[in-house]
């Protein structure tokens, strides 16, 4: 059973379509976990800030390769969708992503 409702499945599909450049995807595969790890690491500010800054730098480099601005500029929910995208991408080889997030839906025409 999917844990995402239709709206969030659509957000994930749109996010996936928006990040279709392999270099952008690679920077996100590395940068998103760095940003996520930086939050609890803020207990040691130099470590947390370094992870946070490097992670976001990778995000922006990826979007430079992609040729578009970060998706969250238009909708802040995409900050959370980025983390879901990372989990979806990491689990894709196992097939568990379909069980968690449902069958992939096509991106919306405005994605």
Regions found by a protein language model. Give the residues of each.
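Interhelical loop and helix-boundary elements at the membrane-water interface
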Residues: 18-27, 64-77
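Structural signal for membrane-spanning alpha-helices in multi-pass inner-membrane proteins
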Residues: 39-42, 59, 63, 89
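Membrane interfacial helix-start motif at the N-side
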Residues: 9-39
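Membrane-proximal soluble regions of multi-pass membrane proteins
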Residues: 1-14, 68-111
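Transmembrane helix interruption/hinge and helix-loop junction motifs
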Residues: 41-49
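Hydrophobic alpha-helical transmembrane segments
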Residues: 26, 48-53
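Transmembrane alpha-helical segments that form the membrane-embedded catalytic/substrate-channel core
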Residues: 51-69
